[in-house]
A protein has these predicted regions:
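Domain-length cofactor-binding catalytic modules of enzymes
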Residues: 2-29, 37-41, 50-56, 65-68, ...
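Short beta-strand-to-turn element immediately C-terminal to the catalytic PLP-Schiff-base lysine
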Residues: 59-61, 82-83, 312-313
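N-terminal cap/recognition module
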Residues: 64-85
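Compact, glycine/acidic-enriched structural inserts
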Residues: 78-117
Length: 397
């Protein structure tokens, strides 16, 4: 579908979704954001839903300001995927061992590595920039520096919620590895620290929503936030890269006879800020549950733990600030899903997938999400599909 504009907003709110299908709370969030004087436009993706801090599935383009609560607490959260030389014919009948080996190699939930992962010992891992990245830890906010040991041991770990590690097949029978994670606890603590600072600034008093608090360019607070933000985004990228390297090691060992080969990795953030230029103006673009989809750029749009996901290539639609959805998008809250569904429903909806089917992941049941096929149909002018993949193993935290 092409976009529709939300009427009555102070700046263009272009929506790649049916406005009637969007919760009132999410619509109010969007209207509130549009009132900020630094806003130059909003693009709303088809996976849109109400979110903490800002609407999930929104792209917020601002000149000279950024809203830290809109980025959220999982700075740099995103996806990585890689196609392998393995095919369905290489797979064993029982995939439970593979799932167990993945869970042994990559800590999930609140878990962390007993010792810091040495990237130099990971097959093919590009270590250039690694030492420089960690040297910049000395320059981040003093309030979180005591977390350095935890940050190093959580590097290469999954987390919980909708984060996952999946072993997938595409329609041609090729095996893909895919995972979803972010900046772990260090990103959360940095985000909360800066959100608190923003909400105490004089120019942010009296806002209709305290989550609209912004940092303004050329101020010490903005400089500090952007320094920590970009470091956390890099942490998230490294976190996924190390997880993927550990995942590949498992696959090499489990499929030793097949001698798997891995293609170039695709990686994309979907909770982050980027400096981009539109209509001759330098903007700070916040993608809150959205991926960049510039012309020819690869991206990953996952479904849920029982549905398909998509590898895509961007079409470079500037009306959407070169963006696309980050997934299917929730259609009910986690608590609502737990009240409505049972573990029997979860078993039914994840049939054929080697995964957890207990009450601890009931809030991730596929029916709690919008139909991914509908979401993809609504953004045909934002991305083209490169591959449709479906998980056969799913690891959750």
């Amino acid at each position: 579908m092409s976009y529709v504009e939300v009427p009555g907003a102070k700046v263009p709110i272009r929506m790649w979704a049916d406005p009637a299908s969007v919760e009132d709370g999410a619509m109010q969030q969007l209207r509130n954001v549009s009132t900020l004087p630094w806003i130059k436009g909003l693009a709303v993706m088809p996976d849109v839903h109400y979110g903490k801090g800002a609407t999930v599935g929104s792209v917020i383009a601002m000149h000279g300001a950024v809203c830290p609560a809109a980025v959220g607490v999982d700075i740099g959260c995103g996806m990585s995927a890689v196609r392998t030389s393995l095919t369905a014919n290489d797979l064993p009948g029982d995939l439970s061992r593979l799932r167990s080996k993945i869970e042994q190699a990559i800590p999930v939930g609140r878990g962390m590595h007993g010792d810091t992962v040495d990237p130099g010992k990971l097959h093919g891992f590009p270590t250039s920039g690694w030492d420089d990245f960690w040297s910049r830890f000395d320059g981040i906010a003093e309030a979180v520096k005591f977390r350095q040991e935890r940050a190093t041991k959580q590097m290469g770990t999954l987390g919980s919620g909708n984060h996952m590690i999946e072993f997938c097949l595409d329609e041609a029978g090729a095996v893909w590895l895919m995972l979803h994670s972010g900046s772990r606890n260090i990103g959360k603590e940095l985000a909360e620290h800066h959100i608190g600072i923003a909400q105490r600034l004089a120019h942010n008093q009296g806002l209709v929503d305290r989550d609209l608090a912004v940092f303004i360019s050329e101020t010490p607070q903005m400089t500090g936030y952007r320094n920590d933000l970009y470091w956390a985004q890099e942490y998230a990228k490294y976190n996924r890269a190390i997880m993927m390297a550990l995942f590949k090691e498992v696959v090499r060992k489990e499929f030793k006879k097949a001698r798997p080969v891995f293609e170039r990795e695709i990686s994309c953030h979907h909770n982050y800020v980027a400096e981009e230029r539109y209509e001759g103006m330098d903007l700070l673009v916040t993608r809150k549950g959205a991926i960049r989809a510039g012309s020819g750029e690869y991206g990953i749009i996952p479904g849920s733990m029982g549905t398909s996901s998509y590898i895509v290539k961007g079409l470079g639609n500037e009306k959407a600030f070169n963006s696309a959805s980050h997934g299917a998008g929730r259609r009910m809250s986690r608590n609502a899903a737990k009240r409505r569904f049972t573990t029997r429903d979860l078993e039914e909806q994840t049939r054929g997938v080697e995964c957890r089917k207990d009450s601890g992941v009931l809030d991730e049941i596929p029916a709690a999400y919008k139909p991914i096929e509908q979401v993809m149909e609504q953004q045909r002018d934002l991305v083209e599909v490169v591959a449709k993949i479906k998980q056969i193993v799913c690891v959750k935290g």
